[in-house]
């Protein structure tokens, strides 16, 4: 579908109700979501573009999506991309929103097998307030749900050949975000070793933790341990820019970096 507008709507379900996504644009173009309140038990917004068999046949991305002035509460992810994204997600902006009591703020779910057209590009999050979000930013390239999610091919951290099954995460921008009362981790970025996350740019971001922070996993993939008040974890990222990024109150190192090719700190 093209040219969709959702304005001033309330979407409400019990916070413990499974499979209750609020709004899932799939292979849609020119979507505006303005002033919508979400309070539910799953992802508030989940942007998708089909599994690989659909992507090969239709190859239709979700593109030009603008989310602003929304309130998102109690879901797994405030704004989720994937995991069905064989057509890709291009030009998505989230701004001037409030996320409260969600498991994650941004939640990217992808993995090997989604296909070479499963490209995420020009993803922008700015001017956001997050409170009691367990982990504000998650990019997980080893998402393990669905029947094939726990296969060796999907979960292995070894370098595999880049082929027509390999997804790609390109540039993401995060600006002017205040994250208070976080619980699990400041951010969790886990890219594929053979196709690293191309670029993460972060500017003017503050992250602090709840005194009684809960312990849980920041991302749904094999080998990820539960944590509480963890700093930022970034693995397999080609370029990471941290411009006035402040993490306060973490337990352990503020930054855990592995396989980051270029780090710029200002």
Predicted regions and their residues:
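Extracellular/periplasmic carbohydrate-active domains that bind, remodel
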Residues: 1-266
